[in-house]
């Protein structure tokens, strides 16, 4: 059983908290401390952002984090090194990489999939890869035991949902809002209806992200989704607490996890 499946199974019907940070923001050492701290405070799955110069799906908070990481010279290989170091002391917590196709394409799909598996990556989500064109990367990830994770939006067609249901591993990431990460408003009734609809086709967990900014919104989403995904709010905490990132993020993650238990 994969680490992601084990993580959901261990919750015994409870809801997972998936916590996102951008690797290298503010630096590699802090990234590792944040990863361990988030797990200690209740994060069930870690989602690591791969810095990219044109993060079109990300709002301003995560865009700034990517800029800071790129200014530090962080590359995809550095991200894999971070996972490798994390695995020296944590062999249980699932780690998912979230980013854009360009850095993966530059490395080569086969090399990337092999190196990701060796480093201890459990899943990969490339936000700008339509399901219709992802087959070359999907095959390499599958051959190396790494889950290919897909986004589903409110506008995703039924045919595309069916295709994703056949290919997806680990969990499916439902984008609760039209727009970019960090967007403000969240209609939990609409999300609930959509999750119920999606589970007619999808038999793996569905996590909901975009627009979850506090314990109350996490609690509401946790009632209807299998996992609550929080990114911009955590990254903003890093941005606003220079020198005290780990403590600030740890406190936030604990608050969020308490809300979704």
Swiss-Prot record:
<dbReference type="Pfam" id="PF00290">
    <property type="entry name" value="Trp_syntA"/>
</dbReference>
<keyword id="KW-0456">Lyase</keyword>
<keyword id="KW-0028">Amino-acid biosynthesis</keyword>
<keyword id="KW-0057">Aromatic amino acid biosynthesis</keyword>
<dbReference type="InterPro" id="IPR013785">
    <property type="entry name" value="Aldolase_TIM"/>
</dbReference>
<dbReference type="GO" id="GO:0000162">
    <property type="term" value="P:L-tryptophan biosynthetic process"/>
</dbReference>
<protein>
    <recommendedName>
        <fullName>Tryptophan synthase alpha chain</fullName>
        <ecNumber>4.2.1.20</ecNumber>
    </recommendedName>
</protein>
<dbReference type="GO" id="GO:0005829">
    <property type="term" value="C:cytosol"/>
</dbReference>
<dbReference type="GO" id="GO:0004834">
    <property type="term" value="F:tryptophan synthase activity"/>
</dbReference>
<feature type="active site" description="Proton acceptor">
    <location>
        <position position="58"/>
    </location>
</feature>
<dbReference type="InterPro" id="IPR018204">
    <property type="entry name" value="Trp_synthase_alpha_AS"/>
</dbReference>
<keyword id="KW-0822">Tryptophan biosynthesis</keyword>
<comment type="similarity">
    <text>Belongs to the TrpA family.</text>
</comment>
<comment type="function">
    <text>The alpha subunit is responsible for the aldol cleavage of indoleglycerol phosphate to indole and glyceraldehyde 3-phosphate.</text>
</comment>
<comment type="pathway">
    <text>Amino-acid biosynthesis; L-tryptophan biosynthesis; L-tryptophan from chorismate: step 5/5.</text>
</comment>
<comment type="subunit">
    <text>Tetramer of two alpha and two beta chains.</text>
</comment>
<dbReference type="InterPro" id="IPR002028">
    <property type="entry name" value="Trp_synthase_suA"/>
</dbReference>
<dbReference type="InterPro" id="IPR011060">
    <property type="entry name" value="RibuloseP-bd_barrel"/>
</dbReference>
<feature type="active site" description="Proton acceptor">
    <location>
        <position position="47"/>
    </location>
</feature>
